[in-house]
Amino acid sequence: FSKKMCVELGYDSYGDVEYVPHVLRYYIANPETTVTNESADSILKELKENNTAPPEAWKVIEKGASLIGSVKYSMKKRQADGRDNPEFLDCSSFTAWSFHKSGITSVPYASNTGTFISSNKFEDISGDKLQPGDIGLKSKTGGTGGANHVGIYCGTLKNGTVVWIHCTSSSSTSLTGNSEGAMFGAYTNFTYFRRLKKWNKG
């Protein structure tokens, strides 16, 4: 747009040449979510039948599930810029993407695990109070990078399996057939839990 206006008006420069992409990263262009991975879609349906949560929480989980089978894990190559179809994310940018793309724009795309620990948009909860949409971290004090991990609680399946959606470099607890990247998993190493304040029922 800026280049076009330069030509039309005869200017050498015209504002921010990256203005349009800078604005569009905050625009949620596709509110409808499609989960293409069959295992993920089946698990998501069972989770919704077996658990209660605010509609906004399910939107977060659905957004994350839409990346299962397409997003690979990488801290170095993570594309934490809000693009619609990222190829690489790490645990925190995946969690942030899921929240932000579902409409909760107070969670920045470039979040790291430290962001989720310190954010005043979330508050601490105990593990026995978990509801779908809550987040879990390995540690309250762990640093960023490989020292910590974050994911989104999704509820339990009918057989009692506790399900998290997260993005990881490797996992032996995947429920969606992939051992790397975005997945539903029976992950058990989260010890610190937080909830978006507006979802807290008190």
Residue ranges and their predicted role:
Residues 133-134:
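Structural motif
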Residues 97-117, 155:
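Short, basic/aromatic beta-hairpin or loop at an interaction surface
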Residues 6, 11, 15-29, 35-41, ...:
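Aromatic- and glycine-rich peptidoglycan recognition patches
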Residues 76-82, 112-119:
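Short linear capping/connector segments at secondary-structure termini
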Residues 3, 24-105, 141, 146, ...:
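N-terminal capping segments
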Residues 129-130:
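Short, well-ordered loop/turn sites that connect or cap secondary structure elements
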